[in-house]
């Protein structure tokens, strides 16, 4: 199973993740069976890319049907060609017996991904194109502080079910009170956005983070203060095609800001976020999210 409307950066599939808490909060998935073949190459300097052909059977595990020209699809096949490319133009690399490794990380870094359906191949049901882009920037200061910027954008053309559009990474439980909604924070998620609240066929996302030096309160209590702001903008083309699920769009924008106190004790921290702007909710408490953070420090 996989989260609906989530973006998977194929070139990141071999990235090393110690702990990713967000999946434990997700409640809406789709079942899929896929076969794929591809090639990974680092032929172009300072890039890594994956070129892939795949055929996927998809069955949403929630109340949803895709309406294409009056025909309702509750399950479907997607045959696609995809290229996913990471480009780190300012980093330094070293060639080793086991391959090329990044020895000095420098920013910005860029990731591109293009997916195209293949009509009349492998029982493919829909014709579409999907373009995704991401850039990351990080500035480390001599005093130990750090500023991080992240920008992502996605755009779809053609006919594509909700399962493969964009949800902009919500991470707020659909429960009544602030205490009931306390859960683990994601890395780059909208912490005040409820699951399945917004969907988009095109979107842009920006995140700003600034990390201050750790505050020495007690011998083992040294929290790391981080200020965070996030914003998103998007829209849904052909909304009449998506049947059975209620949602909103990001046409008016989405904004949240917050403070993280990470690694208060043994990697455990606490954070709070506030939702504001055009999509602010009527009840004050519904705009607040309190989260638990966890960071495992391996010492390198």
Specify the residue positions occupied by each region the protein language model found:
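Exposed, low-structure sequence patches enriched in small/polar residues
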Residues: 1-300
């Amino acid at each position: 199973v996989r989260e609906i409307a989530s973006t998977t950066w194929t070139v990141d599939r071999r990235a090393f993740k110690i702990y990713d808490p967000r999946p434990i909060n997700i409640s809406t998935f789709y079942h899929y069976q896929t076969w794929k073949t591809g090639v990974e190459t680092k032929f172009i300097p300072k890039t890594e890319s994956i070129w892939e052909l795949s055929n996927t059977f998809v069955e949403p595990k929630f109340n949803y049907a895709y309406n294409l020209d009056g025909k309702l699809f509750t399950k479907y096949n997607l045959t696609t060609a995809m290229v996913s490319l990471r480009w780190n133009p300012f980093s330094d690399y070293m060639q080793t017996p086991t391959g090329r490794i990044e020895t000095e990380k420098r920013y910005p870094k860029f990731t591109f991904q293009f997916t195209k359906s293949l009509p009349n191949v492998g029982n493919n049901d829909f014709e579409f194109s999907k373009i995704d882009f991401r850039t990351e920037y990080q500035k480390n200061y001599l005093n130990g502080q750090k500023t991080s910027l992240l920008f992502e954008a996605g755009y779809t053309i053609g006919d594509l079910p909700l399962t493969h559009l964009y949800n902009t990474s919500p991470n707020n439980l659909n429960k009544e009170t602030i205490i009931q909604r306390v859960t683990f924070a994601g890395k780059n998620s909208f912490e005040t956005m409820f699951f399945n609240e917004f969907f988009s066929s095109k979107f842009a996302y920006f995140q700003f983070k600034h990390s201050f030096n750790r505050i020495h309160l007690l011998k083992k209590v040294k929290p790391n203060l981080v200020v965070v702001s996030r914003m998103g903008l998007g829209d849904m083309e052909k909304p009449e095609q998506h049947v059975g699920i209620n949602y909103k769009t990001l046409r008016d924008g989405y904004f949240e800001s917050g403070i993280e106190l990470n690694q208060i004790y043994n990697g455990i921290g606490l954070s709070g976020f506030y939702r504001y702007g055009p999509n602010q909710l009527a009840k004050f408490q519904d705009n607040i999210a309190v989260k638990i953070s966890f960071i495992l420090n391996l010492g390198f």
